[in-house]
């Protein structure tokens, strides 16, 4: 019995380096693109920090008319400016009405930086919407959304 135990122990010790090598090989991603990861600001898990901004109905909604149209034109221009600067990963409206109007996923690490960007948006300046800020840790691949989105619509942004 001792001999069987000793043989099993020796075999398991001999197999340990092989198992470790297999585990390391399995942990290496054959699709990993170091240059892309660096470009997108990815950490070792392929993730990065963002701030999720939820835009809610504000205290001063503007009535339909030229002032409201101009405000929203400025809002969309601000979205494009943030995307062009690489500061906006995702933006869009919530469907179905209600208090929640839209969202931004800003590619900044702190709420303070997000607040500084959002406070330049006409819908926030005018009080049409107010913003809630939530730190978010998500895939760095979100940074590709603006690049891909431009290729999906035949209309200019």
Show where each model-derived region lies:
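Bacterial N-terminal signal peptides
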Residues: 5-16
């Amino acid at each position: 019995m001792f001999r069987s135990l000793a043989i099993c122990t020796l075999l398991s010790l001999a197999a340990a380096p092989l198992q470790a090598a297999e585990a390391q090989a399995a942990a290496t991603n054959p699709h990993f693109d170091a240059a892309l990861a660096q470009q997108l600001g990815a950490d070792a898990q392929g993730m990065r920090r963002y701030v999720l901004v939820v835009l809610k109905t504000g205290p001063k909604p503007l009535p339909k008319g030229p002032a409201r149209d101009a405000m929203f034109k400025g809002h969309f221009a601000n979205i494009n400016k943030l995307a062009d600067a690489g500061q906006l990963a995702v933006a869009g409206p919530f469907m179905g009405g209600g208090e929640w109007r839209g969202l931004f996923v800003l590619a900044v690490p702190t709420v303070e930086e997000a607040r500084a960007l959002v406070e330049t948006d006409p819908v926030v300046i005018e009080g049409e919407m107010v913003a809630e800020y939530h730190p978010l840790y998500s895939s760095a691949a979100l940074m590709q959304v603006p690049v891909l989105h431009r290729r999906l619509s035949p209309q200019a942004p």
